[in-house]
Amino acid sequence: MKKVNIGVAGLGFGKEFAAIYCDHPLVDKVAICTRNPETLNKVGEELGIPEELRFTNYDDMISHEELDAIHIVTPIKEHYPQSIKALRAGKHTACTVPMATSLDELREIVKTSREVGKIYTMMETSLYTREYLYVKRLKENGELGKIQYLKGDHMQNMSLEGWGDYWQGFPPFWYGTHVLSPILDLAGTTAKSVRCLGSGRVNKERAEHYGCPYAVETATFRLRNSDIVAEAHRCLFERVF
C-alpha cells in the first residue's frame, strides 16, 4: 500500500497526532506547522522532523507538493478557513471538532470537498474511547437486545487552567459532537430533525462572549429511518459562576 505524507497544523493537542503519524507504518513524511518558532523546532527535534518540513506559515505548508493530506488541530475560529484552504490546495483534509460554527460554513466545507474531489474528515475522538468501544462491542455481540431509546451526556469544565479564553461562554452544542457521535454510531443512522433547549445561566461575562446565556443545552433528535428517539445533554462548565 502506498504511504502518505501528512502535514499537521497546530502543535498543542496536534503534537500528539504528529507523534502518532511519525510512528504509523503507512505514513512516510510528516510536516508540522505552528506560528511559534520555538515550539516548532522543539517538537521537530523531538520527533526527528527535518527542518524543510517545519513551517510557521500555514499557506506555505499546504502548498508543499509532496503532502497528500492536512490535519488541522488549531483554535476553533481557524477550522473553517483553514479547512477550505487545504481542500482548495488539493489536499485531503482532517480537522478536529467542531468543523465550523455556522450552517453556512458547514455547507461550504461539504460543497468544497465534493467540488475538488478530496476527502474531508471531522476528527471526532469520542468514538474511540475505551468506554464507547466496550458498549459498541456489546451491541455487535447482541447483548443489548433491541435499542428503544438512546441518551448521552458529555460534561466538561472549560474554566480549568489550560483552556483558551475563546472557550469561555462557548455555546454547548456548537461543540456537540462528543455526545452525539456515539449515539448516532450505535443507532447506525443520522439525525433527521432536532429540538434544542437551553437551561440555567452562565455569568454575564461568559454570556456576552457568544450571546449564549445557557449553562446546559439539551437536544432531542429524531433519527433517519429509525423508530428511536435520542436525547443529548451538553455542558462546558462545572461551575457557571
Description of each model-found segment:
Residues 24, 64-65, 129:
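Acidic-histidine catalytic/liganding microenvironments
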Residues 49-112:
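Beta-loop-alpha module in the N-terminal Rossmann-like domain of NAD(P)-dependent dehydrogenases
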Residues 31, 69, 149:
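Short, Asp-centered acidic motifs that coordinate Mg2+ and/or phosphate
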Residues 27, 52, 91, 118-120, ...:
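Short, well-ordered coil/turn segments that N-cap beta-strands
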